[in-house]
From Swiss-Prot:
GO MF, any single term: tetrahydrofolylpolyglutamate synthase activity
Main location: cytoplasm
Enzyme class: ligase
PANTHER family registered for this protein in UniProt: DIHYDROFOLATE SYNTHETASE-RELATED, FOLYLPOLYGLUTAMATE SYNTHASE-RELATED
Any one Gene Ontology cellular component term annotated for this protein: cytoplasm
Alphabetically ordered keywords of this record: ATP-binding, Cytoplasm, Ligase, Magnesium, Metal-binding, Nucleotide-binding, One-carbon metabolism
Gene that this polypeptide is encoded by: FOL3
Pfam family name, one: Mur_ligase_C
Family to which the UniProt record says this protein belongs: Belongs to the folylpolyglutamate synthase family.
Lineage, opening ranks: Eukaryota, Fungi, Dikarya, Ascomycota, Saccharomycotina
Protein's cellular compartments: Cytoplasm
Keyword Lyase assigned: no
List of residues binding Mg(2+) 2: 153
Residues that coordinate or bind Mg(2+) 1: 123
Name of protein: Dihydrofolate synthetase
Length: 427
């Protein structure tokens, strides 16, 4: 199975399943970067004792079940397998030829329907207009959010920001009452979304594009001081503004009833590995030795630029060690050019096959090395194909001599390293 955009296959499969998506109350998120963060903010704030808040985000970080959660708890493996067996049988018996992502999306919808979730926070997989998640009727979407849009997946979405924006804005369908877009987007992007909203009668809110002293102003709760929240990276402020714009709309229209203190308390507890995530990485099963790392799933040009802003703020001009793997087919220049300097070291590796995504594989480290040398980014390059050996080799360097270690380039790399780390904790 590979990536095949379109709604015809999943529409037929869901019909055979009884159309569970038509009973869900949804918040739908599209964009290039920041979608997962917005989803995490939304699901965290919406959680109440009596509420079931479903969240569907991809790709998964450690296990495929991580993609489908209720109140941040992954779908039980047995439940996941039972729904998948049902879907695969329908897919085969009706010769639908659904993709892996379409099957995963249907699994989420069926689970959320069975559990009777009060809200479902749904992240677009790729693009928006023809993404499997867009099978949800517009009338079921309480509001939509669009994060920062930049060049990525050009072979599927188009080669210009305007083309890509039209695909992302496709989640705004007939019946969607309200949409929030990140105000730091290019004017051309915002204009595309404005035109889409105007054509379909969806009210549009453009978030503040300035930092403004790390404040977020809302109609429902007044101002929030973000200095009191654990937000790494200024771009997370802009992601949070999208989420807060959506929550503000829900509160103003009496679709939720949450106090300002509850919002602040829940935001303060938000945590997600793989996004500017600091950890002491345990690299073997026997000793308790660890090595400190910063892990970030930056995998395209705009994400790399934001990561660099954070690194310069934290480390100044200090030399860094990057541990990197890149998904095959990615444009290397936008990712590597902002990150690498002649004073930096790069350890190139590869991730293994990704569960549930057989079309995903890593770029050959030798290919990345040749590109880095040709571009003259740095000459300090090491290739280590065995992920189990990458971080132990750095752990033997003394604390005084060890450079800060940054793992980036792919969420699949982050996920596999976390699996190794977790397996060592269990042993």
């Amino acid at each position: 199975m590979a990536i095949e955009l379109g709604l015809s296959r999943i529409t037929k499969l869901l019909e055979h399943l009884g159309n569970p998506q038509n009973s869900l109350r949804v918040l739908h998120i599209a964009g290039t970067n920041g979608k997962g963060s917005v989803c995490t903010y939304l699901s965290s704030v919406l959680q109440q004792k009596s509420y079931q808040i479903g969240k569907f985000t991809t790709p998964h970080l450690v296990h495929v079940t991580d993609s489908i959660t209720i109140n941040n708890k992954p779908i039980p493996l047995e439940r996941y397998q039972n729904i998948r067996l049902q879907l695969e049988a329908l897919n085969k018996s009706h010769s639908l030829k659904c993709t892996e992502f379409e099957l995963l999306t249907c699994t989420a919808f069926k689970y959320f329907y069975d559990v009777q979730c009060q809200w479902c926070v749904i992240e677009v997989g790729l693009g928006g207009r023809l993404d499997a998640t867009n099978v949800i009727p517009g009338a079921n979407k309480a509001c939509c959010g669009i994060t920062k849009i930049s060049l990525d997946h050009e072979s599927f979405l188009g080669n210009t920001l305007s083309e890509i924006s039209k695909e992302k804005a496709g989640i705004i369908t007939e019946g969607v009452p309200f949409t929030v877009i990140d105000g730091t987007n290019e004017a051309s992007v915002i204009n595309v979304v404005k035109e889409r909203c105007k054509a379909l009668g969806s009210e549009l809110s453009v978030t503040d594009s300035q930092l403004n002293g790390n404040m977020i102003d809302t109609n429902s709760w007044g101002c929030f001081d973000l200095a009191k929240l654990p937000l790494n990276g200024e771009y997370q402020i802009f992601n949070l503004r999208v989420a807060m714009g959506m929550l503000d709309y829900l509160q103003m229209n009496e679709l939720i009833d949450i106090t300002k203190n509850e919002v602040s308390t829940r935001l303060a507890k938000v945590d997600w590995p793989g996004r500017l995530y600091r950890m002491d990485y345990r690299f073997d099963k026997v000793s308790n030795r660890t090595v400190p790392i910063l892990m970030d799933g930056a995998h395209n040009g705009s994400a790399a630029v934001e990561l660099v802003k954070y690194l310069r703020k934290e480390y100044g001009n200090q030399p860094l060690t990057f541990v990197m793997a890149v998904t095959h087919g990615k444009n290397l220049e936008p990712l590597l050019q902002p990150l690498l300097r002649p004073i930096d070291q790069v350890i190139l590796t590869r991730f293994n096959n990704v569960e549930g995504m057989p079309w995903i594989h890593a770029t050959d480290p030798e290919e990345i090395k040749d590109f880095i040398l040709t571009q003259g980014y740095t000459k300090e390059i090491v290739i280590e194909n065995d992920l189990h050996q990458v971080l132990p080799s750095l752990a033997h360097v003394s604390d005084e001599q060890r450079r800060p270690i940054v793992v980036c380039g792919s969420l699949y790399l982050c996920g596999e390293l976390l699996r190794i780390h977790n397996s060592h904790l269990r042993n």
